[in-house]
Amino acid sequence: EAVFHAISLARRNHVAVAFDLDYREDTWDTVEEASLYLSLAAEKADLVLGTRDEFDVMEHLLHTGNQDDAKSAAWLLEKGVSVVSIKKGKKGSHVFTKEGKTVGGIYPAQVLKTFGAGDSYSSAFLFGLLHNMELKDSLRYAAAASSITISGHSCSDSMPTLEQVEDYIAHHEYVLPDTP
């Protein structure tokens, strides 16, 4: 209820709503309950981010078995969502807008742990959008931030600064996935 109240307040005050699905199985009674509430919140957002697995949970009731990123994005775009970002780990990301699909790449890195990668991605991606960067540049920032985070030993200590992200972009190779 608090989430829906916050979304309503944001809407009334012309504040954009970014919704990160951030599904954690142990916080829900059933996948059906998670699917219902995640989809209700997502369709009220301006921007929705999540992993492919999180989109699968959200779509459990609406589009059972769907694995098609474009279909996952289409129903949200039809509801008025402006940006849909599907994080795919080492396969990059797919971002959908009404203008079409943009494929985000990765900065290959030595993985010490994966936790925190999604938070780094989301925060850097949103930073780029809030600073009026091109979508492709926001995706580079997101990929760099994720790579820095997974290369560190702890989650919070590995969260990069803006300077670290920009240095990483300048000195590392950005790789687009073979199959978009």
Identify the role of each PLM range:
Residues 8-12, 60-180:
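Conserved phosphate-binding/catalytic region of the ribokinase-like
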Residues 1-71, 91-92:
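Conserved beta-alpha-beta core of the PfkB/ribokinase-like small-molecule kinase fold
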